[in-house]
Every structure is written in C-alpha cells, then in structure tokens.
Amino acid sequence: GYKARPHPRFPSHACLSVNDCVVHGTHDMTTAPLKEGDVFSIDIGVLHEGWIGDAAWTYAICGTDPQNLALMNAGKDCLAAGIKAMQPGRPLLDWARAVEDVAEKKAGFKLIRGLGGHGYGRTLHGPPFISNVIPKHSGEWSDAFTPFKTGMLVAVEPMLTVGTSSVRSEGRNWPLFSSDGSMSVHYEADVLITPEGPLNLTEGLFDLPDVVGT
C-alpha cells in the first residue's frame, strides 16, 4: 500500500469510504455488506508506464434519499465549476472560490477544511496543495496565490458533508470521518492545464451512474 508520513503504510489497494467516512476508508472497516441507503466512494490510483492517475467517485446504494442525492449533486457540480475556473495564469484560489460558491453558498453543505487536491505525475502526491475552501487567514494556505501554469497536472478533490467542515480519526489510523457523523461524499478528477484552459483527463467519470445496486 501507499506510504505517507506520519501514517502507517496504507493497507488496501483502494480507498473505500462509506457514509460518514470522508476519505481513506480501508478494507477492514468495510467488512459489512453495503445496504440500501448507504453512500460510498471509491478512490484509486493507477500506475501506467511511469505515470500515475488518481481519481475518486461517490455512489448511492439502491435508495434515492433526497438529501444524499442533493449532496452528491453538489459534489459533482462544485467539481465541474472548480475545473472551469482553473485557467492558466489564474491563482489556485480561483478553484476554491468556485467550489465554495457552489457547495456551501448555493447548496448549503460543508466542505472539509484542511484536506484538498495536489499535484501528481510521476509520483502520487506533490505540490501544490489545492484547498477546497477560501483561507480564513494568510497562513492557512500558502499556495493560494500560486498560478495555474500550462503543463501542470493536478488532482482536485472536493469533500463535502451534510453538517461539518472538520474530520476525526482514530489514533494514527488512515480513515477520516466527519466529526459529527454526518453523511459525506468525495469526488476527485485529474486535470491538465493547457494553453487553452483546463483539460479534465477523467471527464468520463461524469457519465457514471449515481445509484448502483438497483
């Protein structure tokens, strides 16, 4: 599994996060069968000819709970809006402004603070860090005014919950849960910045169904 300090090596081949698990769900926490009404995300990395892809998508099991579907739609909508804002020469902050406007101001949900996207390519994680929220103070996000540059490869990944912007963990274990136990979703796309604007290398994810297991 993937190794990132200070965490132990990730014990699974994919992150499987169910309901209030925002990210980094592991195989040993998802042993119970998924049931109607559950929401779960799959986050995987792929290595091909020395290059890495990193993407995540969220699904609902069988049921069509209105709040769950609204949360999922907000996740997809803010991802799409954020990608459109990733124009060469513009600051990374433009991404966060677009995402926050859709997810929080318009949809009324909460974005997780302190987690976000990242550069990638030959390695899974690299600079810059890409926050999903506008920083509250100058020291919260040092890369906020770093510009998007032609040739940049970035993985952007809004994480939303129904009720909180914070997460909790159990010791040094990988899974991160919404601190209030509320439902969460996670979407991640790989984007190449071109002279003409952002190119979503994972555009096909938007064609996936929201509800599975019916």
Regions found by a protein language model. Give the residues of each.
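Active-site neighborhoods and metal-handling regions in enzymes and metal-associated proteins
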Residues: 1-214
